[in-house]
Amino acid sequence: VLSSADKNNVKACWGKIGSHAGEYGAEALERTFCSFPTTKTYFPHFDLSHGSAQVQAHGQKVADALTKAVAHINDLPNALSDLSDLHAYKLRVDPVNFKFLSHCLLVTLACHHPEEFTPAVHASLDKFFSAVSTVLTSKYR
């Protein structure tokens, strides 16, 4: 459960990301594909090379979804219901992949914002990404 301090940390951190969110989303996807090669199986039609337009576009989608989640941090299930349906029923993404992407998002944010990435912010973002992952996999059952 996200505490009020966690929510404040997430909102503050995401606010500093600003216009770089799509770029960071794409970088996190690239890290995920490199570190966890099995994740590539969900993107057989993508050019997965560094800087690919398709990875950039999907990174923007990831960032947009997370921006929406931050804006609706008190009601993640309703805010992410459509995405949960998509990933559970149409795409059938293995739930472990959300953990992989979450880890790579944390690494990416830590690389770009080392001063702001305090242990408290790290913990809050980790809890937030876990909460988002839980919502996205909630309809698998």
UniProtKB/Swiss-Prot annotation:
Chain positions recorded as heme b binding sites: H87
Subunit structure: Heterotetramer of two alpha chains and two beta chains.
Binding residues for O2: H58
Domain of life: Eukaryota
Role noted for this protein: Involved in oxygen transport from the lung to the various peripheral tissues.
A GO term from the CC aspect: haptoglobin-hemoglobin complex
Tissue-by-tissue expression: Red blood cells.
Residues found modified as Phosphoserine: S3, S35, S49, S102, S124, S138
Statement: the UniProt record of this protein carries the keyword Transport: yes
UniProt-listed InterPro entries: Globin, Globin-like_sf, Globin/Proto, Hemoglobin_a-typ, Hemoglobin_oxygen_transport, Hemoglobin_pi
Residue positions, PTM Phosphothreonine: T108, T134, T137
Keywords, sorted A to Z: Acetylation, Heme, Iron, Metal-binding, Oxygen transport, Phosphoprotein, Transport
The name this protein goes by in its record: Hemoglobin subunit alpha
Residues with the N6-succinyllysine modification: K7, K11, K16, K40
Sites of Phosphotyrosine modification: Y24
Pfam family, one: Globin
Gene Ontology terms for molecular function: haptoglobin binding; heme binding; iron ion binding; organic acid binding; oxygen binding; oxygen carrier activity; peroxidase activity
Modified residues (N6-acetyllysine): K16
Family membership noted in the UniProt record: Belongs to the globin family.
Keyword Transferase: no
SUPFAM superfamilies noted in UniProt: Globin-like
Globin domain: residues covered: 1-141
Gene: HBA
Alphabetized Gene3D superfamilies for the sequence: Globins
Gene Ontology terms: biological process: hydrogen peroxide catabolic process
